[in-house]
Amino acid sequence: MPKHGKKYLAALAKVDRSRFYTPAEAIALVKETSYTKFDATVEAHLRLGIDPRHADQNIRTTVALPHGTGKTVRVLVFAQGEALQTALDAGADYAGSDDLIARIDRENFFDFDVAIATPDMMGKVGRIGRKLGPRGLMPNPKSGTVVQPADLARTIREVKGGRVEIRNDKTGILHVAIGKVSFTSQQLSENLAALMEAVKAAKPSGAKGTYIRSVTLTSTMGPGVPVDLVAVQNLKL
Protein backbone atom coordinates (compact mmCIF):
# COMPACT_ATOMS: atom_id res chain seq x y z
CA MET A 1 0.00 0.00 0.00
CA PRO A 2 1.50 3.38 -0.99
CA LYS A 3 2.48 5.79 1.76
CA HIS A 4 0.89 9.23 1.69
CA GLY A 5 2.36 12.47 2.95
CA LYS A 6 1.07 14.64 5.77
CA LYS A 7 -0.66 17.08 3.43
CA TYR A 8 -2.61 14.31 1.72
CA LEU A 9 -3.61 12.73 5.04
CA ALA A 10 -4.75 16.12 6.36
CA ALA A 11 -6.86 16.61 3.24
CA LEU A 12 -8.24 13.08 3.47
CA ALA A 13 -9.33 13.70 7.06
CA LYS A 14 -11.75 16.36 5.79
CA VAL A 15 -13.62 13.82 3.64
CA ASP A 16 -16.29 11.68 5.31
CA ARG A 17 -16.01 8.42 3.36
CA SER A 18 -19.24 7.12 4.88
CA ARG A 19 -21.44 9.66 3.10
CA PHE A 20 -22.19 10.85 -0.41
CA TYR A 21 -21.93 14.56 -1.08
CA THR A 22 -24.16 16.69 -3.26
CA PRO A 23 -22.34 17.97 -6.38
CA ALA A 24 -22.06 21.45 -4.83
CA GLU A 25 -20.64 20.03 -1.58
CA ALA A 26 -18.24 17.75 -3.45
CA ILE A 27 -16.92 20.57 -5.62
CA ALA A 28 -16.40 22.80 -2.57
CA LEU A 29 -14.58 19.97 -0.78
CA VAL A 30 -12.36 19.21 -3.77
CA LYS A 31 -11.32 22.87 -3.90
CA GLU A 32 -10.75 22.92 -0.13
CA THR A 33 -8.66 19.73 -0.06
CA SER A 34 -6.39 20.65 -2.98
CA TYR A 35 -2.94 21.26 -1.52
CA THR A 36 -0.64 21.49 -4.56
CA LYS A 37 1.28 24.68 -5.28
CA PHE A 38 0.13 24.62 -8.90
CA ASP A 39 -3.41 25.04 -10.24
CA ALA A 40 -4.56 21.45 -9.88
CA THR A 41 -6.86 19.71 -12.34
CA VAL A 42 -10.30 18.64 -11.13
CA GLU A 43 -11.26 15.19 -12.39
CA ALA A 44 -14.46 13.15 -12.40
CA HIS A 45 -14.16 9.38 -12.15
CA LEU A 46 -17.25 7.40 -13.15
CA ARG A 47 -17.53 3.66 -12.56
CA LEU A 48 -19.90 2.22 -15.15
CA GLY A 49 -21.93 -0.97 -15.31
CA ILE A 50 -20.40 -2.10 -18.59
CA ASP A 51 -18.30 -5.08 -19.62
CA PRO A 52 -15.24 -3.64 -21.43
CA ARG A 53 -14.49 -7.11 -22.82
CA HIS A 54 -17.37 -6.56 -25.24
CA ALA A 55 -16.57 -3.96 -27.90
CA ASP A 56 -20.21 -2.84 -28.15
CA GLN A 57 -20.22 -1.87 -24.46
CA ASN A 58 -17.18 0.40 -24.54
CA ILE A 59 -17.77 4.13 -24.28
CA ARG A 60 -16.11 6.42 -26.80
CA THR A 61 -17.69 9.79 -27.36
CA THR A 62 -16.97 13.49 -26.85
CA VAL A 63 -18.35 16.31 -24.75
CA ALA A 64 -18.01 20.05 -25.19
CA LEU A 65 -17.35 21.39 -21.70
CA PRO A 66 -18.96 24.85 -21.49
CA HIS A 67 -15.94 26.28 -19.66
CA GLY A 68 -13.21 24.09 -21.14
CA THR A 69 -10.63 22.23 -19.07
CA GLY A 70 -8.30 25.12 -18.33
CA LYS A 71 -5.63 23.42 -20.39
CA THR A 72 -4.11 24.77 -23.59
CA VAL A 73 -4.82 22.11 -26.21
CA ARG A 74 -2.29 21.68 -29.02
CA VAL A 75 -3.95 20.50 -32.21
CA LEU A 76 -2.26 18.79 -35.16
CA VAL A 77 -4.16 18.34 -38.43
CA PHE A 78 -3.44 15.95 -41.28
CA ALA A 79 -4.80 17.65 -44.39
CA GLN A 80 -3.82 18.74 -47.88
CA GLY A 81 -4.82 21.35 -50.42
CA GLU A 82 -7.41 23.90 -49.33
CA ALA A 83 -8.15 21.92 -46.17
CA LEU A 84 -4.59 22.48 -44.98
CA GLN A 85 -4.97 26.24 -45.19
CA THR A 86 -8.39 25.99 -43.53
CA ALA A 87 -6.77 24.17 -40.61
CA LEU A 88 -4.09 26.81 -40.17
CA ASP A 89 -6.61 29.63 -40.42
CA ALA A 90 -8.75 27.94 -37.76
CA GLY A 91 -5.87 27.87 -35.29
CA ALA A 92 -4.26 24.46 -35.73
CA ASP A 93 -0.83 24.40 -34.11
CA TYR A 94 0.51 22.08 -36.80
CA ALA A 95 -0.92 21.11 -40.17
CA GLY A 96 0.49 19.14 -43.07
CA SER A 97 0.34 15.93 -45.05
CA ASP A 98 3.26 13.74 -46.14
CA ASP A 99 5.82 16.04 -44.54
CA LEU A 100 4.11 15.89 -41.15
CA ILE A 101 3.64 12.13 -41.31
CA ALA A 102 7.34 11.70 -42.15
CA ARG A 103 8.36 13.97 -39.28
CA ILE A 104 6.34 11.96 -36.76
CA ASP A 105 7.73 8.71 -38.13
CA ARG A 106 11.33 9.91 -38.29
CA GLU A 107 11.61 12.12 -35.22
CA ASN A 108 8.95 10.61 -32.93
CA PHE A 109 7.37 14.06 -32.87
CA PHE A 110 4.42 14.07 -30.45
CA ASP A 111 4.32 17.67 -29.28
CA PHE A 112 0.52 17.84 -29.58
CA ASP A 113 -2.55 16.74 -27.62
CA VAL A 114 -5.10 15.97 -30.34
CA ALA A 115 -4.69 14.85 -33.95
CA ILE A 116 -7.41 15.50 -36.52
CA ALA A 117 -7.51 14.23 -40.10
CA THR A 118 -9.62 14.61 -43.20
CA PRO A 119 -10.86 11.26 -44.61
CA ASP A 120 -8.61 11.43 -47.68
CA MET A 121 -5.54 11.45 -45.40
CA MET A 122 -6.39 8.38 -43.34
CA GLY A 123 -4.72 5.92 -45.71
CA LYS A 124 -1.41 7.71 -45.22
CA VAL A 125 -1.93 8.38 -41.52
CA GLY A 126 -2.50 4.65 -41.02
CA ARG A 127 1.18 4.09 -41.76
CA ILE A 128 2.08 5.70 -38.42
CA GLY A 129 -0.83 4.20 -36.54
CA ARG A 130 1.57 2.03 -34.56
CA LYS A 131 3.03 5.23 -33.09
CA LEU A 132 -0.12 7.30 -32.72
CA GLY A 133 -2.43 4.55 -31.46
CA PRO A 134 -0.70 3.64 -28.18
CA ARG A 135 -0.55 7.34 -27.28
CA GLY A 136 -4.26 7.88 -27.92
CA LEU A 137 -3.47 10.23 -30.81
CA MET A 138 -4.82 8.25 -33.77
CA PRO A 139 -7.67 10.14 -35.50
CA ASN A 140 -10.92 8.22 -35.25
CA PRO A 141 -14.46 8.92 -36.47
CA LYS A 142 -15.89 7.77 -33.11
CA SER A 143 -13.95 10.46 -31.29
CA GLY A 144 -14.90 13.09 -33.86
CA THR A 145 -11.34 13.53 -35.12
CA VAL A 146 -11.84 12.31 -38.70
CA VAL A 147 -13.86 15.08 -40.32
CA GLN A 148 -14.76 16.41 -43.73
CA PRO A 149 -12.95 19.59 -44.84
CA ALA A 150 -16.20 21.55 -44.44
CA ASP A 151 -16.28 20.64 -40.73
CA LEU A 152 -12.58 21.12 -40.07
CA ALA A 153 -12.60 24.71 -38.80
CA ARG A 154 -15.53 24.06 -36.43
CA THR A 155 -13.90 20.90 -35.08
CA ILE A 156 -10.58 22.65 -34.40
CA ARG A 157 -12.37 25.46 -32.55
CA GLU A 158 -14.37 22.96 -30.49
CA VAL A 159 -11.29 20.95 -29.51
CA LYS A 160 -9.37 24.06 -28.53
CA GLY A 161 -12.41 25.42 -26.73
CA GLY A 162 -12.86 22.47 -24.42
CA ARG A 163 -14.21 19.46 -26.29
CA VAL A 164 -12.81 16.35 -24.64
CA GLU A 165 -12.93 12.67 -25.47
CA ILE A 166 -14.72 10.33 -23.09
CA ARG A 167 -13.33 6.81 -23.12
CA ASN A 168 -13.51 4.07 -20.49
CA ASP A 169 -10.45 2.21 -19.31
CA LYS A 170 -10.16 -1.58 -19.27
CA THR A 171 -11.97 -1.77 -15.93
CA GLY A 172 -15.00 0.22 -17.12
CA ILE A 173 -14.09 3.49 -15.44
CA LEU A 174 -14.10 6.95 -17.04
CA HIS A 175 -11.48 9.50 -16.02
CA VAL A 176 -12.35 12.99 -17.28
CA ALA A 177 -10.83 16.39 -16.47
CA ILE A 178 -13.60 18.92 -15.85
CA GLY A 179 -11.53 22.00 -15.08
CA LYS A 180 -9.06 23.51 -12.64
CA VAL A 181 -9.26 24.23 -8.93
CA SER A 182 -9.15 27.94 -9.84
CA PHE A 183 -12.46 27.61 -11.71
CA THR A 184 -15.53 28.91 -9.90
CA SER A 185 -17.83 26.33 -8.33
CA GLN A 186 -20.46 27.27 -10.91
CA GLN A 187 -18.08 26.61 -13.80
CA LEU A 188 -17.12 23.21 -12.41
CA SER A 189 -20.77 22.35 -11.78
CA GLU A 190 -21.76 23.23 -15.35
CA ASN A 191 -18.85 21.23 -16.77
CA LEU A 192 -19.86 18.26 -14.60
CA ALA A 193 -23.47 18.58 -15.77
CA ALA A 194 -22.34 18.52 -19.41
CA LEU A 195 -20.25 15.42 -18.74
CA MET A 196 -23.12 13.58 -17.05
CA GLU A 197 -25.46 14.34 -19.96
CA ALA A 198 -22.91 13.05 -22.47
CA VAL A 199 -22.29 9.86 -20.50
CA LYS A 200 -26.00 9.15 -20.14
CA ALA A 201 -26.52 9.72 -23.87
CA ALA A 202 -23.70 7.28 -24.68
CA LYS A 203 -25.19 4.36 -22.72
CA PRO A 204 -24.59 1.15 -24.71
CA SER A 205 -27.71 -0.88 -25.50
CA GLY A 206 -25.98 -3.99 -24.16
CA ALA A 207 -25.24 -2.54 -20.70
CA LYS A 208 -27.11 -4.46 -17.99
CA GLY A 209 -28.26 -3.29 -14.57
CA THR A 210 -27.23 0.03 -13.08
CA TYR A 211 -25.34 2.04 -15.69
CA ILE A 212 -23.62 4.74 -13.63
CA ARG A 213 -22.52 3.02 -10.43
CA SER A 214 -20.38 5.64 -8.74
CA VAL A 215 -19.08 9.16 -9.28
CA THR A 216 -16.03 10.51 -7.49
CA LEU A 217 -14.48 13.97 -7.78
CA THR A 218 -10.84 14.64 -7.02
CA SER A 219 -8.08 17.15 -7.65
CA THR A 220 -4.55 16.31 -8.76
CA MET A 221 -2.96 14.35 -5.89
CA GLY A 222 -5.99 15.07 -3.70
CA PRO A 223 -8.40 12.64 -2.02
CA GLY A 224 -11.49 11.34 -3.79
CA VAL A 225 -14.86 12.79 -2.80
CA PRO A 226 -17.86 10.45 -3.35
CA VAL A 227 -20.84 12.13 -5.01
CA ASP A 228 -24.53 11.36 -4.52
CA LEU A 229 -25.63 9.49 -7.66
CA VAL A 230 -29.19 10.81 -7.80
CA ALA A 231 -28.15 14.43 -7.33
CA VAL A 232 -25.31 14.34 -9.85
CA GLN A 233 -27.48 12.71 -12.52
CA ASN A 234 -30.09 15.43 -12.03
CA LEU A 235 -27.63 18.26 -12.69
CA LYS A 236 -28.83 20.65 -15.38
CA LEU A 237 -26.88 23.12 -17.47
From Swiss-Prot:
User: Sorted alphabetically, which HAMAP family does this protein's record hold?
Assistant: Ribosomal_uL1_B
Q: Which GO terms describe its biological process?
A: regulation of translation; translation
Species assigned in the record: Chloroflexus aggregans (strain MD-66 / DSM 9485)
Q: What's the protein name?
A: Large ribosomal subunit protein uL1
CDD domains named among the record's database cross-references? Ribosomal_L1 (cd00403)
Q: Give the GO molecular function terms.
A: rRNA binding; structural constituent of ribosome; tRNA binding
What InterPro entries does this protein's entry cite? Answer: Ribosom_uL1_bac-type (IPR005878), Ribosomal_uL1 (IPR002143), Ribosomal_uL1-like (IPR023674), Ribosomal_uL1/biogenesis (IPR028364), Ribosomal_uL1_3-a/b-sand (IPR016095), Ribosomal_uL1_CS (IPR023673)
| Gene3D superfamilies for the chain | 3.30.190.20, 3.40.50.790
Instruction: Quote the gene name from the UniProt entry.
Output: rplA
